[in-house]
A protein has these predicted regions:
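Short, compositionally biased low-complexity segments
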Residues: 1, 20-23, 93
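Short hydrophobic motif
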Residues: 11, 18, 22-23, 52
Length: 119
């Protein structure tokens, strides 16, 4: 039995953009991470994170009411197939561990104050 992981054309455009973005913008950071250091790396990815947010791809694992995209598991899997090609890509897209798991727990069980502060 074959599984069909095709998606609608609009989302496929996002995936195509992600693939190119990761290859052209994120992979090069891997070669200079040691030179940048942690703080320099955060500064370097900040504008990339803004581009991801502008494309509507930030925190895809969270529902929209909590600042995410709520894309569902199949689309999230397709995204992670691309993001998994770089150790830094999940951070640029707002779904790096452990933050992604912690945010999901807060989304399900956090108080309104915790959700407001951390999500």
């Amino acid at each position: 039995m074959a599984w069909d992981f095709s998606t609608e054309p609009e989302f496929q455009e996002h995936l195509d953009w992600m693939r190119q973005f990761v290859r052209e913008q994120i992979w090069p950071l891997e070669t200079i991470y040691d030179e940048l250091g942690e703080e320099g790396f955060r500064r370097a990815i900040a504008p990339l994170q803004e581009q991801v947010k502008a494309r509507g791809l930030w925190a895809a694992h969270l529902p929209p009411e909590l600042g995410g995209q709520g894309v569902g598991q199949v689309k999230l899997g397709l995204m992670h197939e691309i993001l998994g090609t770089s150790p830094f890509a999940p951070a640029v897209f707002g779904n790096a561990a452990p933050d992604s798991g912690n945010s999901e727990i807060l989304a399900l069980a956090g108080t309104p104050e915790q959700k407001e502060r951390y999500l």
